[in-house]
A protein has these predicted regions:
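Alpha/beta-hydrolase fold nucleophile elbow
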Residues: 111, 189-200
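Short, solvent-exposed turn/loop segments enriched in Gly/Ser/Thr/Pro and often Arg
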Residues: 145-147, 198-202
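Active-site loop->helix "elbow" adjoining a glycine-rich segment at hydrolase catalytic centers
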Residues: 118, 169-173, 201-202
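Surface-exposed acidic, glycine-flexible loop patches that form ligand/cofactor-binding
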Residues: 101-108, 183-191
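Sec-dependent signal peptide recognition
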Residues: 2-9
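Alpha/beta-hydrolase active-site loop
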Residues: 94, 163-187
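Non-catalytic accessory segments of hydrolases
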Residues: 19-168
Length: 202
């Protein structure tokens, strides 16, 4: 019995504590919870960083997320953006990002890596980031509009735009995601003043 108590005490003192991040996290738009990936990594998948770019918001600058009430469970990635080389679930409603963190609380100040996937602006989607989080960094992977949905410019679209221009919606999605990081990443234990952008191909 004494041996069992010793084993339990050793386990308790050597187990990572995620009391802070296991509770709902308050973002600008509302509260969320994530899921444990093991090895002390927490994942928050499918977080909206802009309103769905559909209907009147198609071929427009990304717009702020509409706030929600209650707590959303973020344990599944959002759909991939529309593309030709893909057999996964796709949708125009695709402006979601994912966060992997090994922080033990929101008071931590871990470096943040923002991954922008490749694919020549035409295909692919977000990657998994648990390996980065397991090595002391927070990884954010981002979806963005591609093909005609991300880059098409046309005089008629420019006339409808508040800024008088059209095109480059995919890059504007990148900027919206980075603004989201600046506003929210500290809630995941990240340092908003230590953010690195990286990627490949695109």
């Amino acid at each position: 019995m004494n041996n069992l108590r010793i084993i339990l005490l050793v386990f308790a003192f050597n187990s990572p504590v995620f009391a802070d991040l296991e509770q709902p996290i308050q973002l600008d738009a509302g509260q969320i919870t994530g899921t444990s990936m093991g090895s002390g990594v927490q994942a928050f998948l499918g977080i909206p960083f802009a309103s769905p770019p559909v209907g009147d918001l198609r071929w427009r600058e990304p717009q702020p997320v509409i706030p929600w009430s209650g707590v959303k469970v973020m344990d599944r990635k959002g759909p991939d953006c529309m593309q030709s080389r893909n057999t996964n679930l796709m949708s125009e409603d695709c402006l979601y990002l994912n966060v992997w963190t090994g922080a033990q609380s929101s008071a931590d100040k871990l470096p943040v890596l923002v991954w922008i996937h490749g694919g020549g602006w035409r295909f692919k989607a977000t990657y998994d980031g648990d390996a980065f989080a397991d090595n002391g960094a927070i990884l954010v992977s981002v979806n963005y509009r591609m093909n005609a949905f991300g880059w098409m410019a046309h005089p008629a679209l420019s006339e409808e735009s508040e800024n008088g221009v059209s095109g480059n919606y995919g890059v504007l999605d990148h900027l919206a995601a980075l603004e989201w990081v600046q506003s929210n990443i500290e809630q995941f234990g990240g340092d908003k003043d230590n953010v690195t952008i990286f990627g490949e191909s695109a």
